[in-house]
């Protein structure tokens, strides 16, 4: 199906989505009712049941679908290669977070409720409504509408649904190693992110990477009495404090030598679009009781959190911290430190540079141990890519607002895995809202997000169709 043919079907496809929204919602409710909590071994049968449910739905749509075992929870793989033109891989996850604390839920977490709101919106309240079952099904239901109207999809589609995203996807990298050739596509589509706001869709094209390190400073061979050894003995807490203080520059940058090697400036076009976004720097910080940005001076808050690397201290441990007072010089002190990375930074080179920086600050009679807590590289989608351009256009048509090109200060290891192992870029297109309470009691997904999410994917599939028949 070429783009002209897809365009002739699109209005009927969108009408089909609207006419069948109740049936789509019923299917979502069926999936939500399966308590596929991946972290709890007691729910392993439920994870398998959710995978089988998805396989069945895909099979009914004409996908060649199968459930693939892993060391823990199964993958669901489906292919519909009957279409022409580009080949996309859609990724989602069927596992959910635990519901604790159960007492804070207003209703059964696995019995979805439609809750009308004063503003006219309706919330779908249940665990997994937003993260990620509701989001995942927006794509499946868009495929269903295309099949019902046109008999086929406008493009070639593969899907990968996993059941371990909420536990950091331990089975995904080895699965990609063995199944990568089958899953290789022109682009990955991920529906597990937020819109910019309730009316403005967004495509996330950049994710920061992360490097997590723990350092342990050892000095004396036992804890010491400060009245006897103070001044004469090295205090590892002081050594650690000096190291931590040395990591940042006065203007908010990172002082590790070579840290910014390979880091490039944000394109002017992206800076200009971010400046047009309705974002309030003062409000962003005011919500958390702060008022002054702490990152590199001369850069906007969005640039600081989306497009610049950072260093954060997450914990300092050592000495006496219980009630009362104890005048001890501890034998050891430790800290947990992470670096958010951007495109152009190699996590292993940053690790080496950080460790060299720390070693340079270790005095005689003291030693340091490093504990590696993992790392992943940043990912960036080319801003002039055809898939991004077409997706932005389709989203803008559906929402009647210019779709935003967004970044994310966080890290999604699966996106790095798709890039590193299969060489595939990812477009992150989600319809959640910042107030959806994912991972918290009373998680919700807006009914309008579900409906317009389905319509958005229907438009994107049409937009991706090739130009000529």
For the regions a protein language model found, what residue spans apply to each?
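Histidine/acidic-residue-rich, glycine-tolerant segments that coordinate divalent metal ions
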Residues: 154-234
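N-terminal helical capping/dimerization or prosegment-like subdomains
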Residues: 2-102, 332, 336, 349
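Zn-dependent metallopeptidase/amidohydrolase metal-coordination segment
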Residues: 216-218, 240, 307, 325, ...
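Acidic-enriched catalytic cores of C-N bond-cleaving enzymes acting on peptides and small amides
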Residues: 205, 226-316, 345-367
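Active-site metal-coordination/substrate-binding segment of hydrolases
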Residues: 85-161, 452
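A short beta-alpha structural unit
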Residues: 38, 339-342, 369-384
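C-terminal catalytic subdomain
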Residues: 242, 318, 323, 327-353
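Generic non-transmembrane alpha-helical segments
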Residues: 16, 27-30, 57-61, 145, ...
